[in-house]
Amino acid sequence: MSKLYVGSEVGQLRRVLLNRPERALTHLTPSNCHELLFDDVLLVEAAGKEHDAFADTLRQQGVEVLLLHDLMVDTLAVPEAKQWLLDVQISDFRYGPIFARDLRRYLSEMDNEHLATILLGGLAYSELPIQSASMLPRMKQPLDFVIEPLPNHLFTRDTSCWVYGGVSLNPMMKPARQRETNHLRAIYQWHPIFAGQDFIKYFGNEDLHYDNANIEGGDVLVIGKGAVLIGMSERTTPQGVENLAANLFKHGQAKEVIAIELPKHRSCMHLDTVMTHMDVDTFSVYPEIMRKDLHTWRLTPKGNGEMQVEALHNYLHAIERALGLNHLNIITTGGDSYEAEREQWNDANNVLTVKPGVVIGYERNVYTNEKYDKAGIEVLTIPGNELGRGRGGARCMSCPIERDDI
């Protein structure tokens, strides 16, 4: 079995991809944060220290931590990768042929450390030292971005997701995040950890416009035993689910996909903001999605490249059947209705399981953490006063690359 393999949500976590908050978050302001999909601006230094505590907690549990910036630097050292990234991101269509040529030349002469920082963190016109005959830069304001920052790269879960023996390079819903996928495409193609390794690229690795076939990793739970649970949120579409399912079945990597239609609002942005897998038979669930009237479907391979789509009445029963369990242990968000809503907003349900029954979550969610503890789940708490303002918890901020089956 390849080491590039994720067989579950709760098996021993062995290797994970994180992205420490740095330059991109310094470009967040009250006037642009909503366009960049943040509700607020963060104290970047404090957020970095909180993230370091998260990474250290993972290392203490024996998990190898890979950092996105480091992988980008290594990938840019491969000439073919550097050329591809500059060609795809600094195109004539985006910038016009004159400015694109000048900008590519400027960026190609940077050292790889600096270039990785710019590609991830953005570049304003006021920070650009070159002159160009193009009309475009003359029409821009100093604080306009030449290269938009990617603060949502903090949430490495979404851009790519490993599902059993392969990875989906996800076509993201929002323009503010779509460039992120190119970075992961380059890393998985050329970085020494991944180059030449035996793994499948299910979806999203082609130079295509994916139209409405969007999927994000926060909606994808690899619940094990050949089953995948996917939420259809405001960021993941039925078209995206069906395309990923078709490729999982084509490569024999999944037996079934359970798809749940989620409420379309900010607090329910992804499935993992309202539901995570904590132990073989235990899930954390926000009460709002306990409703039995949530539309649910079961997708299975039919042969000849076709799929069968079956409407279901209860997604929890579907999970029980997929995992061969008689009963699921459901832990709902803690506190009264007010406290539960506050803690869900602060990612109480968005925990990262490092091994069966042991999870990482924000220390601020005291009511929910207490419920987890009483149910026999060990919570390794991390600070999240700044990170939590980005509306993502430990699961959102991590992309497992190697994890055991259950």
Swiss-Prot record:
GO terms for molecular function: arginine deiminase activity. Its EC number is 3.5.3.6. One of its GO terms (biological process) is arginine deiminase pathway. It catalyses: L-arginine + H2O = L-citrulline + NH4(+). It comes from the Bacteria. The active site is at C396. Pathway: Amino-acid degradation; L-arginine degradation via ADI pathway; carbamoyl phosphate from L-arginine: step 1/2. Pfam families: ADI. GO terms for cellular component: cytoplasm. It is found in: Cytoplasm. InterPro entries: Arg_deiminase. Keywords: Arginine metabolism, Cytoplasm, Hydrolase. HAMAP family: Arg_deiminase. Belongs to the arginine deiminase family. This is Arginine deiminase. It comes from Vibrio vulnificus (strain CMCP6). The lineage of its organism: Bacteria, Pseudomonadati, Pseudomonadota, Gammaproteobacteria, Vibrionales.
